[in-house]
């Protein structure tokens, strides 16, 4: 009889233990977004999204009250996805990524994208807003250069849901003031950037500036992208490129 009672008691204890375990999995996770590393001198607002595999969705525009501090929320336990964007409001970024409209350049965006398993009572995620854009500044050094228009083309049109460079058509016609023009570029996946010299509706010449930028030692894989300065000296029979301390000159025949 004692053995029978012990068996029943053991079974009840086992059932209770399973029940407690199941209840704990149903309890939410306390998610702490650590925003201490966000540079508030550069990023004034961040659009933050949180999704969990079980369907929870959170979106908040965080200003200086939150940036540089912590933000705490409760989320269902499971796989958690976090996105944060700064400087890209006009392009409505979100969990699906960021798409640059054809004909426009990249916003001066700072980004964080991550995913992790939140299965415990508490999870902490450090938000690192990386500089995911490069400002290309072009200085014109020749009177002939100003007689033409210029466009930058490429094969990256934004970022996908995991923060990777997204394949797509990119084109931006540059405008110049006092011989200086700028274009904001997204992080490149290859060296396919081109500079088109335009004569009205016609493309007069095309230069593979993506290759020149890489040859200059520029690194598109850095966490925080550097800006780029390029000097262009375009004459009737030659063109010279200078990117930082790197130089290249081309000569070509004039067909009359």
Regions found by a protein language model. Give the residues of each.
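Sec-dependent bacterial lipoprotein signal peptides
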Residues: 1-18
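Extracytoplasmic cysteine-anchoring/structural motifs
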Residues: 18-256
């Amino acid at each position: 009889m004692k053995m029978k009672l012990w068996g029943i008691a053991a079974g009840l204890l086992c059932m209770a233990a399973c029940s407690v375990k199941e209840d704990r999995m149903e309890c939410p996770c306390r998610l702490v977004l650590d925003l201490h590393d966000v540079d508030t001198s550069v990023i004034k607002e961040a659009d933050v999204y949180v999704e969990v595999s079980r369907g929870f969705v959170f979106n908040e525009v965080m200003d200086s009250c939150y940036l540089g501090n912590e933000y705490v929320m409760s989320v269902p336990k499971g796989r958690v996805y976090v996105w944060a964007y700064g400087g890209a409001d006009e392009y409505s970024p979100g969990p699906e990524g960021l798409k640059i409209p054809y004909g426009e350049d990249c916003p001066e965006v700072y980004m964080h994208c991550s995913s992790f398993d939140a299965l415990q009572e508490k999870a902490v995620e450090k938000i690192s807003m990386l500089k995911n854009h490069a400002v290309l500044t072009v200085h014109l050094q020749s009177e002939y250069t100003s007689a033409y228009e210029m466009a930058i083309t490429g094969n990256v049109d934004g970022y996908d849901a995991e923060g990777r460079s997204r394949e797509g058509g990119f084109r931006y016609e540059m405008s110049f003031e006092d011989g200086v023009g700028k274009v904001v570029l997204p992080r490149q996946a290859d060296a396919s950037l081109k500079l088109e010299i335009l004569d009205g509706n016609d493309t007069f010449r095309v230069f593979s500036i993506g290759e020149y930028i890489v040859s200059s030692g520029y690194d598109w894989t850095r966490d925080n992208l550097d800006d780029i300065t390029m000097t262009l000296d375009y004459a009737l029979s030659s063109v010279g490129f200078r990117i930082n301390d790197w130089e290249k000159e081309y000569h070509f025949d004039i067909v009359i």
